Amino acid sequence: MEIETGRMRITERDKECVRFVVEQGFATIEQLWKVAWSDQKNSSYTYNRVLSLEKFGFLKSVKINDTTMKIVTSTPKARIITAESSAYPTPVQGVSKDLVHHQLHLNELRILFQEKGLKDWRSAECLAVDPTFRKLGSRHVPDAFYISSRG
């Protein structure tokens, strides 16, 4: 299903990309390429799609002093579109810029796990707003958890 917003057609891959950023907090172009467009020869197509998603208010660039990579985060508009199609509660706020490097490393783990067939990754941000998770009685929210192919 594609969604028209203004003059941009939001594709399933765009939504997958936006959902990843909403759930993880931040992502690099290279990571989004692995998530949604890895069948493309290189990440230049991803870069152009991300620029369009920025232009139409779904993503925004984040300036981090000690990195040269382009890093994006989600906007309220992105969180709304993700919440409409998510089976789980969606984070209502972004992640603190203090956690960018930590989140980028977690992204690499998530991508690796997904490539190995693991599914249903739930980030700390998603777990923190999920009332069913809080009922488990844990005092600490883990960085993430996932469900293996064996359940």
Regions found by a protein language model. Give the residues of each.
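Active-site metal-binding core of divalent-cation-utilizing nuclease and nuclease-like domains
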Residues: V62, H101, R110-G151
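Short, charged N-terminal helix-start/capping segments
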Residues: R79-S86, N107, I111-E115, K119
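Nuclease-adjacent, charged terminal/linker segments that flank catalytic cores
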Residues: M1-Q93
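Long, contiguous hydrophobic alpha-helical segments, chiefly transmembrane helices and signal peptides
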Residues: C17, V21, V72, H105-L106, ...
